[in-house]
């Protein structure tokens, strides 16, 4: 946090006093203060940014008899450094020069032009294409949590409430906001120590009355009941703090944020943070994107489709009607998915573009991209209708053509306009008569100078006479020194060089003024016409959002169609019956990494047989099998086809995993403690409709303790909860539980033994195996032979 010291008795320069007065309003953000062609940072800001971004730290003047630390960057490099700051969760305030307010001191007026924070940026260059950029806010009171998220790039505003810290954390990790507002006295503050983008807010910022008022004012309504918001006071407090923060950073107008929605946990399959991590749905164990379910399923044609697929995978929906509708759409798309994919690639990131248009911050490039995208709409509608599918015709009805916008953008915009409207050269020729007139004056300077040069040579008989211009002198006449005696009296000498002399004339000065005025006029008219584009398109924003959301969903489903066809997936049967039946199922990720065919396996979980105790050798396929069952359930519940010969999947409300573990030393938790915490959560929260995967419970303690705990946990899951459970173990004694519980079945992964060597078959069979083949695996890992011989000897001693 920056320290701001204002001392009325010090001798700070007017510029430093101005800097400090601005900094007082944004003590926890970097202030980029424009000085000529540089942005400068002073005091603690300079020290911190020099360390963070490797910027040279210098000094400038004194304050309170101490040298002032300073760090600066060229104004042309601003966005590059802002991007780096945003990635590490920091925020910045940009202060621009406006005009001189005191000629005596040279003090220039400066104003805050924008505030840039990780959760509120909408500029394309600062955003990830594949991930929604969320601003989050959480309020904790009376052991409950209110949570709000807003995506300024789409206008999606959600609130939710949670009874436990675990359920809130699950949602926080699912949404993963770039910036999170929390109260100063938040009880679980230590959890956020390593999280980027945390902003501490005063408790009063979450005041419920103020929050209600802000929300009603924003949505222009007398109450929030029309949005389905009733007694959600904690979530409303969080949402109110979020809106207050946006006003603080000068985001007072949010025309594209039209509604607020309550998100209910019961609508989606619950997965806690351990499940998301262990199943490697979005990120792998290392936090990267490779070899994840998303990496296999994502061949989307648009960035917005990619983000929607990610959202679906993070929160699989439980509504069977919606799931079956998606399956039917995929079936209908099989004949046209290739042609649709080509058209969808021309859409780009239209979701974010229309949000920037709504906020009047769209660039010329955005309008050009919109023009290209709208050209595809009619073609997409045609392809959908050509299938004669009623399901696809209903989709096409939600996509409008927007011919009036398309005609305007084709007429008004150049094919390749400048990057910003400030540079000009954005509006097409023949679009506006006044603009064309002033452009002709501004752009015909070279013709005039050529004409003036020819006429002056002829009039004065000076063959060395040339007319030219540069930034310093403007327009000038140049005559070689041998001819300067022929220069007329109305030529005013402005520069003498080694071989020539340069002059100005009243006629050239007048023409130069006319050209400069014309250039200013061109920029003024272009800016006016550019703003007219916003005025024309903004009334269509609500309709455009519906079309864009429809195209995003179409992109995801078209992508899943392509995946189903290319990867040989089948349509699962989703019903409200109990159980999971898969025939010849495959792991969707692993099968794509193997050079040899994947070994298929089946499963049948039913009310009479809902727990499998799985034994088998290390590396035999137990963990892969368990994960593939869970991943197939997730795929089915987002509406995807699945890797199997046949699939029937019943109700599933939650998925839990206890697979692998690691010390959490930062919180003083050992491997075994982590195991027990995760297991406790599973036993407290799972139901008979939950899918539970437990891999080798009890490894982190003694064999006797581990076996006893594993036995007791299985009894609780099988006898009391009746959850659909896959329990892998090397405790062979656990297979005896089948004799006490009729719903338990023993399964094992087979191996072939030959001459003291084994071959993994990766085939699951009924029954159990009482060998783990640990020494064989150790040999495969190339442990020294002396170690292996000693281990074999000890094994015979321990278990003769």
Swiss-Prot record:
One GO biological process term: mismatch repair
Binding residues for ATP: 616-623
Coiled coil ranges: none
Record-linked InterPro entries: DNA_mismatch_repair_MutS, DNA_mismatch_repair_MutS-lik_N, DNA_mismatch_repair_MutS/MSH, DNA_mismatch_repair_MutS_C, DNA_mismatch_repair_MutS_clamp, DNA_mismatch_repair_MutS_core, DNA_mismatch_repair_MutS_N, DNA_mismatch_repair_MutS_sf
Signal peptide: none
SMART domains according to UniProt: MUTSac (SM00534), MUTSd (SM00533)
Keywords: ATP-binding, DNA damage, DNA repair, DNA-binding, Nucleotide-binding
GO molecular function per UniProt: ATP binding; ATP-dependent DNA damage sensor activity; damaged DNA binding; mismatched DNA binding
A Gene Ontology term for the protein's cellular component: cytosol
Keyword DNA-binding: yes
Family affiliation: Belongs to the DNA mismatch repair MutS family.
UniProt name for this protein: DNA mismatch repair protein MutS
Organism: Buchnera aphidicola subsp. Baizongia pistaciae (strain Bp)
Gene expressing this chain: mutS
């Amino acid at each position: 946090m920056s320290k701001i010291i204002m001392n009325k008795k010090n001798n700070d320069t007017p510029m430093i006093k101005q800097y400090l007065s601005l900094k007082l309003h944004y003590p926890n953000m970097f202030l980029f203060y424009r000085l000529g062609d540089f942005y400068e940072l002073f005091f603690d800001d300079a020290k911190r940014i020099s360390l963070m971004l490797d910027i040279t730290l210098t000094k400038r003047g004194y304050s309170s008899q101490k040298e002032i630390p300073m760090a600066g960057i060229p104004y042309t490099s601003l966005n590059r450094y802002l991007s780096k700051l945003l990635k590490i969760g920091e925020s910045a305030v940009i202060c621009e020069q406006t005009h001189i307010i005191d000629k005596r001191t040279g003090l220039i007026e400066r104003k805050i032009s924008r505030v840039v924070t990780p959760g509120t940026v909408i500029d394309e260059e600062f955003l990830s294409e594949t991930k929604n950029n969320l601003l989050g806010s959480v309020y904790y009171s009376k052991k409950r949590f209110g949570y709000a998220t807003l995506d300024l790039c789409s206008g999606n505003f959600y609130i939710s409430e949670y009874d436990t810290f675990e359920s809130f954390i699950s949602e926080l990790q699912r949404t993963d906001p770039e910036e999170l507002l929390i109260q100063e006295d938040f009880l679980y503050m230590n959890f956020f120590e390593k999280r980027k983008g945390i902003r501490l807010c005063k408790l009063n910022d979450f005041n419920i009355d103020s929050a209600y008022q802000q929300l009603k004012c924003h949505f222009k309504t007398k109450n929030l009941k029309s949005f389905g918001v009733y007694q959600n006071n904690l979530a409303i407090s969080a949402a109110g703090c979020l809106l207050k923060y946006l006003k603080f950073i000068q985001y007072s107008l949010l025309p594209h944020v039209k509604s607020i929605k309550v998100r209910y946990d019961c609508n989606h399959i619950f997965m806690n943070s351990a499940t998301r991590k262990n199943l490697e749905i979005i990120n792998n164990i290392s936090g990267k994107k490779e070899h994840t379910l998303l990496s296999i399923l994502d061949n989307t044609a648009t960035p917005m489709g990619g983000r929607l697929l990610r959202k679906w995978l993070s929160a699989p929906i439980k509504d069977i009607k919606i799931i079956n509708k998606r399956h039917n759409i995929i079936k209908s798309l099989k004949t046209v998915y290739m042609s649709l994919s080509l058209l969808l690639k021309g859409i780009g990131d239209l979701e974010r573009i229309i949000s920037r248009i709504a906020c009047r911050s769209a660039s010329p490039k955005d309008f050009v991209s919109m023009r290209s995208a709208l050209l595809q709409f009619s073609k997409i509608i045609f392809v959908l209708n050509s299938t004669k599918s009623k399901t696809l015709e209903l989709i096409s009805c939600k996509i409008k053509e927007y011919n009036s916008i398309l005609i305007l953008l084709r007429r008004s915009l150049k094919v390749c306009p400048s990057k910003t409207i400030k540079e000009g050269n954005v509006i097409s020729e023949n679009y506006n008569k006044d603009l064309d007139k002033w452009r002709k004056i501004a752009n015909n300077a070279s013709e005039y100078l050529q004409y003036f040069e020819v006429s002056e040579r002829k009039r004065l008989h000076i063959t060395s006479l040339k007319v030219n211009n540069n930034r310093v002198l403007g327009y000038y006449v140049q005559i070689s020194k041998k001819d300067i005696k022929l220069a007329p009296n109305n030529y005013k000498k402005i520069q003498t060089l080694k071989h020539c002399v340069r002059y100005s004339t009243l006629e050239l000065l007048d023409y130069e003024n006319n050209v400069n005025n014309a250039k200013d006029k061109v920029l003024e008219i272009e800016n006016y016409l550019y703003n007219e584009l916003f005025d024309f398109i903004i009334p269509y924003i609500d309709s455009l959002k519906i079309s864009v959301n429809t195209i995003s969903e179409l992109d995801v489903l078209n992508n899943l169609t392509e995946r189903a066809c290319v990867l040989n997936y089948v349509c699962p049967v989703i019903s409200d019956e109990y159980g999971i039946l898969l025939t010849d199922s495959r792991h969707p990720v692993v099968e794509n990494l193997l050079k040899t065919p994947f070994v298929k396996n089946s499963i049948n979980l039913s009310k009479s047989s809902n727990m499998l105790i799985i034994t088998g050798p290390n590396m035999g396929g137990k963990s892969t099998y368990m994960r593939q069952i869970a991943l197939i359930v997730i795929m089915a519940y987002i509406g995807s086809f699945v890797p199997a010969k046949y699939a029937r999947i019943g109700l599933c409300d939650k998925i839990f995993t206890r697979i692998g573990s690691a010390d959490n030393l930062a919180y003083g938790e050992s491997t075994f403690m982590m195991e027990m915490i995760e297991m406790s959560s599973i036993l407290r929260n799972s139901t008979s409709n939950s899918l539970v995967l437990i891999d080798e419970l009890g490894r982190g303690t003694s064999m006797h303790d581990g076996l006893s705990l594993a036995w007791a946990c299985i009894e609780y899951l099988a006898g009391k909860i009746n959850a659909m459970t896959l329990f892998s173990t090397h405790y062979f004694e656990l297979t005896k539980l089948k004799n006490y519980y009729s719903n338990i079945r023993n399964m094992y992964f087979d191996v072939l033994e030959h001459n003291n060597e084994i071959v993994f078959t990766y085939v699951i069979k009924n029954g159990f195996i009482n060998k783990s083949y640990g020494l064989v695996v150790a040999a495969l890992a190339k442990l020294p032979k002396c170690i292996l011989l000693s281990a074999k000897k000890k094994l015979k001693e321990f278990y003769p």
